[in-house]
Structure formats: C-alpha cells, structure tokens
C-alpha cells in the first residue's frame, strides 16, 4: 500500500493549489499549515489576508511572499513559473476557497502543466459545493457560472442562454448587485423558478433564503450584505414554451417596447434560432 504524500514527501519544483477557509479558520484543512510552513514561495491574492491567515494558523514561514491577483496575473505567471522550474515549491492561495475557481490561478496552472511541472492541491472549503449542499435544490447535476457580466447587455445574453439549462445553476454575486441579478433571473427564467440565496456561508451570520425568484427579489429589496452565492433550479422541459408562434409573438411584443436587450427578448430569439 502506498503511503499518503506529505508536504515533506512532495518533490521540489511543484505547484500546490491550497484551499483556504471561506469563513471560519477552523475549517482550514490540516495540510494547509504544513504546506504554508514548507513553501519556498507563497503566491497570495492578498498578502495582508495571507498574513492574517498565517497568524490564525500559528504558522511561521521563511517563504518569499508575492502578490498574485487578477491585475498582475499575466505579469507574475512567468516569474512564478521560473521559480517552479528552478526547483522551488510554490503554494498558491486566494482570499477564500480554491484557487482557479473564480479566482486567480488558471494561467499559472496552465503554464505549469505546459512546462511539465507537477501540479497538486490541498483540497479545501468551496462556496460552490457548500451552497449546493444547503440549497435544497437538486445537486446530481449542476453548472457553475461564476460571476455574471457587469454590463447589462452581456448579462442579459448570458441569462438568456441559460434559460433552458436543465442543470442546477450556481452563481457568485456581489451583495450590492444581488437584487438586480435576481430580478433579471426572474425575467429570464420565470419568477416561479426555485432558488436559494446563500449568504455568509460558515460565518457567524450565515443565512440561506429559499423560495421562488420573484419572492427572493422582494426579499433582497431590503438590502443584502456579505458574500453571496446564488443557487437556481434548472429548467424543466415544460418551463420553456418553444412553440414557434408563441416565440414570435413574444419577440414582436418586446420589439414594440424597444427593449431589444431584455432577457425575455434574447431568450425568445435564441430559441427561434435553434428551430
């Protein structure tokens, strides 16, 4: 039987994607402290938050700490790859959850794989899986969409393209945009589509609000705070009227209102194009 690989057994010149807590530091995987302590380089989305994490975990490290976030990811990737090729162990951490999942990391992983560098992970907490588990919605098949586009037209097109998706959908959203996102989902998917707003998962003020999208829009009108993950039930075959005459009538109705970028207009146009 093979022994489990510990940090000391992992060869140098390896990229370690380390999952960090999404709320409570007690949820940190035991291996996280070991990997941080033994790293040659730690690439962190926010070096200040990394320092706090090291303190909370009681970890002392002699690693070289570098920032690695969306704004410098392209420039820093070659630097970190050079360190990996020189035989250093690079540990990548983001503010919360797993690197690469709606967080920095993909470019470095792709570059490391291309260069033949070993890539491994310290599995950790995931807001996506946690939200799915507590949502009360089907989790046998799901689709993670990350953050919706900020521009209204792009956001409407994204939701229109997902209107007929039968898998459960998971989104990240900023608290100040949650009400608008729910309203646009209600328009694109139907106000009776079931969903769950998962807020501050694993933290002191954790809250999961479940119900039809229309009800959740009304709930969010009072304001939403904290980290938000949205889980939306997938479409049922009967939920989307694909009768060509009905779709053309809906398109004409939207054209008369000049709302040519509305989710409803785009949904109907997309469905007609598939006919």
Regions found by a protein language model. Give the residues of each.
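Glycine-rich, flexible N-terminal cofactor/catalytic loop recognition
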Residues: 2-70
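Beta-strand/loop-alpha-helix module characteristic of Rossmann-like adenine-cofactor folds
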Residues: 2-14, 126-254
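Short amphipathic alpha-helix with an adjacent loop that forms part of the alpha/beta core around
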Residues: 7-8, 77-85, 161
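Short active-site oxyanion
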Residues: 36-42, 116-120, 168-169
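Structural motif
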Residues: 45, 68, 93-95, 120-122, ...
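Conserved helicase motor
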Residues: 67-74, 148-149
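Short glycine-cluster motifs
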Residues: 85-149
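Single conserved hydrophobic/aromatic residue that forms the stacking wall/gate
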Residues: 255-275
């Amino acid at each position: 039987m093979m022994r489990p690989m510990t940090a000391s057994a992992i060869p140098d010149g390896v990229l370690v994607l380390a999952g960090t807590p999404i709320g409570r530091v007690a949820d940190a995987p035991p291996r996280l402290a070991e990997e941080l302590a033994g790293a040659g380089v730690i690439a962190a989305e926010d070096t200040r938050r990394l320092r706090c994490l090291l303190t909370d975990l009681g970890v002392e490290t002699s690693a070289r700490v570098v920032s690695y976030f969306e704004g410098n990811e392209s420039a820093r990737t070659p630097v970190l790859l050079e360190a990996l090729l020189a035989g250093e162990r690079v540990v990548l951490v983001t503010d919360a959850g797993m690197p690469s999942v709606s967080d920095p990391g993909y470019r470095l992983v792709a570059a490391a794989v291309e260069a033949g560098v070993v890539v491994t992970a310290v599995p950790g907490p995931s807001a996506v899986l946690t939200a799915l588990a507590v949502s009360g919605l089907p989790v046998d098949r799901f689709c993670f969409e990350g953050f919706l586009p900020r521009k209204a037209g792009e956001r409407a097109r994204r939701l229109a393209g997902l209107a007929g998706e039968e898998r459960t959908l998971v989104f990240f959203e900023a608290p100040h945009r949650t009400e608008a996102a729910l309203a646009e989902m209600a328009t694109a998917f139907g106000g009776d589509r079931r969903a769950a707003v998962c807020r501050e998962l694993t933290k002191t003020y954790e809250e999961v609000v479940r119900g039809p999208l229309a009800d959740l829009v009304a709930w969010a009108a009072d304001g939403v705070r904290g980290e938000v993950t949205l889980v939306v039930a997938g479409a049922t075959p009967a939920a989307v009227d694909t009768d060509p005459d009905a779709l053309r009538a809906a398109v004409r109705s939207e054209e008369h209102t000049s709302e040519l970028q509305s989710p409803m207009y785009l949904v109907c146009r997309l469905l007609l194009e598939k006919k």
